[in-house]
From Swiss-Prot:
Keywords: Magnesium, Metal-binding, Thiamine biosynthesis, Transferase. This is Thiamine-phosphate synthase. Pfam families: TMP-TENI (PF02581). NCBIfam families: thiE (TIGR00693). It comes from Acidithiobacillus ferrooxidans (strain ATCC 23270 / DSM 14882 / CIP 104768 / NCIMB 8455) (Ferrobacillus ferrooxidans (strain ATCC 23270)).
């Protein structure tokens, strides 16, 4: 989806099954969108076979919600689900299919994001293979991934100088530390607990969004 790089900016909210149990799943997702989330990723680690129907229904509903709010919908780690629900974007990790293989499968019909953890060379390779954006982190201790290694904020500065793609920062991001990541070069902040663990999801999303509204150009 050439020309859509501008879609990767602002608050990038990521769903969590524990923080968003099924009875309130869509309501909490919509609250984040009302609060200004520009991107919403469906991240669900349920079994792709036994949970297939639920995953398909949730992903399809999120795609419709995102379209209603003008936000980008992303499926995490599941190319088949992305195709089934017509997701406009797919995010993968280092263990998943490489960007070149996904690009061959989907063509330019989908945005592809790649987790690069703390590796700028890995991000450069992803860019060469056709990725549309790259993600780095965890930058801080993360309640969602407590075992994830913490990487230096300097990675963002180095990547910004060497890679001509939108950059997403992830991992333990809060309203207090997010501004420094934006200043270092992050185009978007990917947040799970900071948004969906909040009692007021919409309010939390608005505060994260304000970090971008208030940044110096």
């Amino acid at each position: 989806m050439a020309g859509d790089d501008h879609l990767i900016s602002g608050l990038y909210a990521i769903t969590d099954a524990h923080l968003m149990p099924e009875p309130v799943f869509l309501a909490r997702a919509e609250a984040a969108l009302r609060g200004g989330a520009r991107i919403l990723q469906y991240r669900d680690k349920g079994d792709v076979v036994t949970d297939a129907r639920r995953r398909r229904m949730q992903a399809g509903a999120l795609r419709e919600l995102c379209a209603q709010y003008g936000a980008l919908f992303v499926v995490n780690d599941d190319p088949r689900l992305a195709r089934v629900v017509g997701a406009p974007a797919l995010h993968v990790g280092a263990e998943d299919a490489p960007p070149a293989a996904l690009r061959a499968q989907f063509g330019r019909a989908i945005l592809i994001g790649v987790s690069c953890y703390g590796s700028v060379p890995q991000a450069q390779e992803a860019a060469t293979q056709g990725a549309d954006y790259v993600a780095f982190g965890s930058f801080f201790a993360s309640p969602s991934k407590p075992q994830a290694p913490v990487v230096s904020v300097d990675v963002l500065t180095a990547a910004r100088a060497m890679i001509d793609l939108p950059i997403v920062a992830i991992g333990g991001i809060t309203e207090a530390n997010g501004r420094a990541l934006i200043a270092a070069g992050a185009d978007a902040l990917a947040v799970i607990s900071g948004v969906f663990a909040a009692e007021d999801v919409e309010g939390a999303a608005r505060r994260f969004t304000a970090l971008f509204n208030n940044r110096k150009e």
